[in-house]
Amino acid sequence: MINLSIKSLWNRWIKLLKSFNKLPAYIDLRYGNDNKYKPHTLWYPPTFHSSLGVAEAIGGERIVPVFLMNTILSTFILITVYFVINSLFGFLPAILSSLLIIFSPRDFMPFLWGQWPERFAYAFVPLILYFFYKYFITYSKGAKKPAYLYITALLLGINILIHPLAFFHSLAGLAVLYVLLLIKQKKFVFNLKHIGVSITIFIILFMLFPFQTFNIFA
C-alpha cells in the first residue's frame, strides 16, 4: 500500500535532494563548507546550472550550448527591460535603457565568460516591479486583480532560486515602489487574502531546495 502522507512525501523529497545536491569529492574539497546550513551540498539552488546541463544534453556537447544559453538569457534581460519601460514610459526611454544595458559588463561578461548566474536573475526585477505596479494601480482604482500580485510572488520565488542577491534587491525595489505609489495614489493598498495566497506561492517555491535557500540565513 502506497503511503502518501505528507511526512512520507517530505522524507522522499529530502532523500532526493540529498542525492541531487551532494557535491562530488573534487568540488567538495574546495567548496564543501560554503553552504553553512548544509555543508557538503550545493550552496546555491541548482536552477541556473541545471538549465545549462539541459542545454548540454540537448546540444550534445559541453561548450556551444552553454554559450548559446547564456546568449538567450542575456538577451532576455534586454527584452524585459525594454518591454517594461516601454509600457510605463514609452519607446524612447525603453530603447535608451536597453541600449545602456548592452554596454554594461554585468550583462555582456556572463555572455563572454559563462559566469555570474546572479546577473540573469536581475532580468526578473523589472517584471516583478511591473506586475506589482499593475496590482497596486488596479487595486487603488477599485478593480481588484490579485493575479498581478500572485505573478509577483511567483517571480520572486523564481528569483531567489536563481540568486538571493537579486531577490533582496527586488524586495528593496518593491518597498520603494510601494511608498512612491502610496504617496502618488494617496491610498493604502492591503488585502490579507491576496497577501496570504502570494506568501503561500512563494513558500512553495522557496521550499523546493531548502538546503540552499536556508543557507541564505545561515
Locate the predicted segments by residue.
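Membrane-embedded transmembrane-helix bundle of lipid-linked glycan/lipid transferases
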Residues: 1-218
